[in-house]
Amino acid sequence: MAEALAPSSSANLGPGFDSVALALEITCRVVAEPAAEWSVTHHGPHSPAPGDDDAVLRAARTAVGDDNPLALEVFNEIPRGRGLGSSAAAFVAGAAAASRAVLGESDPERVFRLAVDLEGHGDNVGAAVFGGLVAVVGNVVRPLQLHEELRVVVAVPSRRLPTQWARHARPEVIEHEAAARSVARAIALIEAFRSGDLQLFAAAAGDELHEAPRGALFPESDDLMFTARSAGALHACWSGAGPSILAVTGPSEADAVAAALVGALDDQVVVLMPEIATTGLR
């Protein structure tokens, strides 16, 4: 028997579209054991609906082949369809647990490449495998420095926003000026996470490439970001494709930001205060 655990993640973080992600200590754990035939059992409230694609099973079969059947058990804490990297964590944990059960080990680079192929983009996968704050370009992933005093608060609306809907909301053509502003904001964001600089976090706000178009689909997310900033957050952004939002705070502001978000959206929101997952796949 073998097991693997992967953290959730918040991707994009505003201007870092499909290239930056932060790992969070909300986890997906998979236990794998050789069996006569393939099976998967899910525990907890965040299980795929009957008929939905099972990311853990697909990753496990891809990692070790159909001829090495496993009985899989999944213990998932990550809300699905809320922009918290649930599919990336499932792919990573499923591939790693299967590899450990059949091959005796799981190479992080192999798991990363396999999960990127399944996921289609590498930001959430990079955070799930390597932890912390990461930058991802294609199959190249590198850790970024993270100021030790930063804290995060996550607001999860009760209503889902399927990732494919959010992706279709993006404009097909981006004006040169908007693209240039986005690059500048991304640079400011990365340095803000390293230094904790308040002015740089402020400069990184206001993404035009994906947050603004998606706001029309789910304006409640924009309301949550406004609430977080008004309560003292250094930075607030869509978490991945949403509708969850991530608020970045200092240590003394986290409780106030969380309290403000708890009362938002007529209480149709769950507020989490996870630790940043400095370690990824384990």
Locate each region found by the language model.
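Active-site rim beta-loop-alpha module in soluble metabolic enzymes
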Residues: 156-216
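Glycine-rich beta-alpha junction loops
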Residues: 26, 36, 132, 156-161, ...
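Phosphate-handling active-site elements
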Residues: 35-37, 65-71, 98-114, 140, ...
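Alpha/beta catalytic cores of group-transfer enzymes, especially the acyltransferase/condensing modules
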Residues: 106-150, 236-238, 242-246
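ATP-binding N-lobe of GHMP and related small-molecule kinases
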Residues: 1-82, 104, 108, 272-282
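Glycine-rich, charge-dense phosphate/pyrophosphate-binding loop(s)
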Residues: 193-282
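DPxDG-like acidic metal-binding loop motif
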Residues: 24-26, 84-108, 129-131
